[in-house]
From Swiss-Prot:
The chain crosses the membrane at residues 37-57, 67-87, 109-129, 134-154, 162-182. It comes from the Bacteria. Keywords: Cell membrane, Kinase, Membrane, Transferase, Transmembrane, Transmembrane helix, Two-component regulatory system. This is Uncharacterized sensor-like histidine kinase Caur_0899. GO terms for molecular function: phosphorelay sensor kinase activity; protein dimerization activity; protein kinase activity. SUPFAM superfamilies: ATPase domain of HSP90 chaperone/DNA topoisomerase II/histidine kinase, GAF domain-like. GO terms for cellular component: plasma membrane. CDD domains: HATPase_UhpB-NarQ-NarX-like. It comes from Chloroflexus aurantiacus (strain ATCC 29366 / DSM 635 / J-10-fl).
Amino acid sequence: MTSPAKSSTAASSSSQRSLSAWSPLGGERFYAAARWVLIILLGVVTQFLTNGGLWPVTDEIGPLEGIFWLYVGFALVFTVLAFLQFAAGLVSISYLFDIAFISLMTFFGGERIVIFFPLYLVPLTYAAIRQSRSVSLLSGLLAAVAYMAAFIAWRRLIAPEALMTLLDYVALALRGTTLAIVPWVTGNLAERQSEFNRERVTQAQRDAEQALSEARAYRDQMRSLYRVALTLGSTANYRQVLDTLLQESQKIVPYRAGIVLLSSGQPNELYVAFGSNLAPGDLNRSLKMDTGLAAALRANTAQVITSFTQFPSLQQLGSLRTCKAAALLPLQAGMRVYGLFVVATDQTLTTDQVEMLMALANYAIVALHNAQLIYDLKEEREKLLSHEEEVRHQLARDLHDGPAQAMAVITMKAEFIKRLLERDPAQALAELDELSSIAKRTNYEVRTMLFELRPLMLETQGLKVTLEQYLDRLRAKAGNTAIVLEGTDIDKVRLGSKVEGALFNMIQESVTNAIKHAKANHIWVRLRRLNDQMLEVVIQDDGVGFDKAAVLKSYERRGSFGLLNIDERARLVGGRAEIDSTPGKGTQITIFVPIES
C-alpha cells in the first residue's frame, strides 16, 4: 500500500514535470493569443473591403476571403502546437508565416491596401522580443520588402491604370523603412531594458548577499559579546578578564598584536602587563608616559592612529613596528584609569570594528572595576579587622595602665586602712582622704575613657559641643600644648549618626597622636562648612612632623598606623581624608565628610 507521503511526493514530481514542459512555451502561447487578436482585426478589415463577403462562406469567395480563412486554419494549427514541447522550434518562427499571410492579403486588398500596414507590427514586435537583434533586423527587412512588393505588384498587375506619383513612392518608402527598423529598434530597447533589469537583479543579489554577510557578522559579534559578558560576569580575576578581552578581540579584528598597558606604580609610567602575538622582550617592558599616551588615557573614546610618530613610547615595542594602524582604547571607569588597550593591525580599521572593540573594552572595564571593588573590599575588611584588634589591645593597655592599677591601689589602701583603724584612727582618716582622692581620679579617668569611646552627648548636643567638652578634658593631659577649636558656619550643620561618630573618632585619634608624637606647641581643630554637601575638618599642629613616604613603607610592613587609617574610615562614610606632613614643619590632616540633606 502506498503511503500518503510517497503519493504526495509522486504528485509533486508530476506537477513539476508538467510545469517544466509548459514553461518554455509561455511567450509562444501569449503570441498565439495575440495572433487571434490580429485575425479578428483582419476579419474586420476583410469584411469591410469585401462589403460583407467574408461571411457566410460560399463557393464563390474571392482570393482575399480565401487567404483569410487559410490564415484562420493556420492559426488553429499553431495554437495547438504552442502547447507541445517538440514543436517549439517551428512555433518560434511562425511569425514569418504571419508576415506572409499579411503580405498576401495586402496584395489582394485593392485600393485600401494601406490599411494592412499596421498589422505587420504584431509579428515584428514578437520577432524583436524573441529573436536576436540581427534576426529581428532581417525579419523587419523581409516584412518591408514583402509589403512594398505586394503594394507595387498590385499596382502593376491588378490595377495598372492607377499611376503612382512621386508622393506615393515616398510614402511607400517611409512605410517600408518603418517596418525595417521597428523590430531592430524594439529589440535594442528590449535588450537594453533587459540588461538594465539584469543589472538591477544582480545588484539586488549583491545587496542581499552583503546584507546577509553583515547579518552573519553582526550575529557573530553579538555571540562574542555574549560570551565576553558571560565570562567576565562570572570572574573577579583581572588576569582572566584581560585574557578574555584579548581572545575575543582577535575574533572581531584579526590583529597583528594586542597589548594591555597598565600602571607600573611609578609616576608617569606604564608597562606591558598582557599581550597576544608579542615580540620577544615586549612583555613587562616599562614605557614612559609621552604626550600621545597621556591624551589616549584621558580620552573617553577609542582613538584610531595610522602612524606611531606621536607615540615614541609605543615605537619601542617590536610588536608594533610592522603595523599600519592601531586602535587605542582607554580602560577607565569613572575617575579611575586602569590602563590602555592597544589593537594593532596590518589593515585600516573600520568604524564598526572600532565600535565593537570599544564594546568589548567596556565589558572588560566593568569586570575590572568589579574585581577592583572586590579587592578593595577585602583589603578594607582586613584593615578594619586589624584596626579593631588594635583598638582592643589599646583599650586593654589603657584599662591596665589606668583604672586597673587604680583599683589595685584602692584595694590595697582599703586593707591597710582596716588594719590601721585599730592602731591609729587619726592616721586612718588621713588615708581615707587619700583613698577618696584616688577613687575620684579613677572615676574621672573611666568617664573620660567612656566619653572617648562613644560620647552620649554627641547624639543630644551635637559635634561642636561634644568636641569642646572632649578637648577641655584633653587639655589636662596636653601639658604645655595649647588646643584651639574653631568653627565657621557649622551651627546648622547636620550629620548622619554614623558619619558624626566616625568623624569624632577621627578627630580624637588625630589630636591624640599629635599630643603623643608631635611635640607641638599648638594644635588647631577647625570645622568649616564648604557647601550644602560637604563639611571640612582640619587638624593641624606645629610639631616635628614626619616623612610621609617612610611612614607609608612602615605601614606596609606593620599593617597598622593610626593616621593612615583615617582616610579608610573617611571613605567608609562617603568622605575622604588628606594627610600632609613635612619633617620640622608640622602635620595637617584634612577630613571631608558629607552633610545630611
